Amino acid sequence: MLVWLAEYLVQYNTAFNVVSYITFRAIMALLTAMGIGLWIGPEVIRRLQLLKFGQEVRNDGPESHFKKRGTPTMGGIMILIAIGVSTLLWADLRNSYVWFVLFVLFGYGAVGFVDDYWKIKRKNTDGLIARWKYFWLSVIALIAVFGIYAVGKDTAATQLVVPFFKDFMPQLGIFFIILSYFVIVGTSNAVNLTDGLDGLAIVPTIMVASAFALIAWATGNFNFAQYLHIPFVPNAGELVILCTAIVGAGLGFLWYNTYPAQVFMGDVGSLSLGGALGTIAVLVRQELLLVIMGGVFVVEALSVILQVGSYKLRQKRIFRMAPIHHHFELKGWPEPRVIVRFWIITLMLVLIGLVTLKLR
């Protein structure tokens, strides 16, 4: 929005030309989103407490979690507000890629909101009926994916980038739709499963979003895309603004979510953030890189799949409890130790992911 205003005002003062630079707007988007999160956080928490929107806790979970029962949830609302306002202010809204991400972000946020509401209303951890939850997540993802495919089907925007391979970038064609669908829905649910400890999901989200800000900038810059041997996607550069808005909103939320948490993001936050990361990965053609950098999310999701599969096939559990962060808690690890170690692992994976851009 401010891009349009600056384009008009630059004729009166060339200083407004600074708004045309992605780096400037990226920094401002981060600061704006973080500022909004810090500002509205106390009021959002207070209203959630008044509405008695408290977290429900599984009775078979770690005993240390029982004290969390009643902690305000649905704090993801403040994340969505911060990202939305910051993006609308600092992004170039003529860019279709920005709208694709916002569509998934708020669409998944709406599904998460309903899911959280039913958990609170029923006073248990069962929210929206699973088949309806996945139905709406799928509908939103497919609408976005078909839109992305329509915009970029004849360009590098539908190539698959394989880490460590410089010249192997197959054109996916219609298979782009299938891959993108699973990336968006899968990432959304993986982040959702990771969100079980204070700050466990939001910090890896911040790290991965920070990395994707760099990748989006390189993907949207012809010279750097050529240098790194990645597809040049002209519209991708504007996603830097969205990525830094996610980082800023995440930092603002972490202020209140760090151990011991004053608020939880709930499904309204985790589903939307995961969906946004998946959509960004699709748009910059780095789905496989997301698997590396978001390795913690992948392992959390796999632990649930393996646990359920093992129990159904063998009537035996692989882990003491899934997702895997609860397994470590039941082994005696204090919650802060689990959280920080998962953060460290994510930092390592993000750095490895960034290095693969050059190791081809």
Curated annotation (Swiss-Prot):
Required cofactor(s): Mg(2+)
Main location: membrane
Catalysis: reaction(s): UDP-N-acetyl-alpha-D-muramoyl-L-alanyl-gamma-D-glutamyl-meso-2,6-diaminopimeloyl-D-alanyl-D-alanine + di-trans,octa-cis-undecaprenyl phosphate = di-trans,octa-cis-undecaprenyl diphospho-N-acetyl-alpha-D-muramoyl-L-alanyl-D-glutamyl-meso-2,6-diaminopimeloyl-D-alanyl-D-alanine + UMP
MF terms (GO), sorted A to Z: metal ion binding; phospho-N-acetylmuramoyl-pentapeptide-transferase activity; UDP-N-acetylmuramoyl-L-alanyl-D-glutamyl-meso-2,6-diaminopimelyl-D-alanyl-D-alanine:undecaprenyl-phosphate transferase activity
Any single Pfam family the record assigns to this protein: Glycos_transf_4
A GO cellular component entry from the record: plasma membrane
Keywords from the named record: Cell cycle, Cell division, Cell inner membrane, Cell membrane, Cell shape, Cell wall biogenesis/degradation, Magnesium, Membrane, Metal-binding, Peptidoglycan synthesis, Transferase, Transmembrane, Transmembrane helix
GO biological process assignments: cell division; cell wall organization; peptidoglycan biosynthetic process; regulation of cell shape
InterPro entries according to UniProt: Glycosyl_transferase_4, PNAcMuramoyl-5peptid_Trfase, PNAcMuramoyl-5peptid_Trfase_CS
Pathway involvement of the protein, from the record: Cell wall biogenesis; peptidoglycan biosynthesis
Chain segments annotated as transmembrane: 21-41, 73-93, 98-118, 132-152, 168-188, 199-219, 236-256, 263-283, 288-308, 338-358
Lipid bilayer topology: Multi-pass membrane protein
EC code(s) of this entry: 2.7.8.13
UniProt-annotated location(s): Cell inner membrane
Role according to the record: Catalyzes the initial step of the lipid cycle reactions in the biosynthesis of the cell wall peptidoglycan: transfers peptidoglycan precursor phospho-MurNAc-pentapeptide from UDP-MurNAc-pentapeptide onto the lipid carrier undecaprenyl phosphate, yielding undecaprenyl-pyrophosphoryl-MurNAc-pentapeptide, known as lipid I.
HAMAP family cross-referenced by the UniProt entry: MraY (MF_00038)
Family the UniProt entry places it in: Belongs to the glycosyltransferase 4 family. MraY subfamily.
Name of the molecule in the record: Phospho-N-acetylmuramoyl-pentapeptide-transferase
Organism, as annotated: Actinobacillus pleuropneumoniae serotype 3 (strain JL03)
The organism's taxonomic lineage, starting at the top: Bacteria, Pseudomonadati, Pseudomonadota, Gammaproteobacteria, Pasteurellales
